[in-house]
Amino acid sequence: MHGRGLAGGSAVVFLVPPVGTLVAVEGVDDAEAVEGVRWVRVYRRPGHVFGSLRTGADRAGAVLATGSSRDEALERARRAADAVRFRVDADAP
């Protein structure tokens, strides 16, 4: 019986910020309000210095969404990820 009655899809989209010192993270509430979003995680706090993305540890967060299909879940996760904005100071050391 395990798994019976389950159908649909899920998707994770990682959040990649611009290079610079993190000033603020905005739009998390908007991202969480997207239909099908199960969670939004932000891994970094203001003051963190982002370099270019080289490894998974350089990511700033992630979004998990579900839907009736893999494509729907991915579209929802992408829409939520687009709502999250990382304000950075590109000139800070």
Residue ranges and their predicted role:
Residues 1-93:
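Peripheral (often C-terminal) accessory segments that flank ATP-dependent C-N-forming ligase machineries
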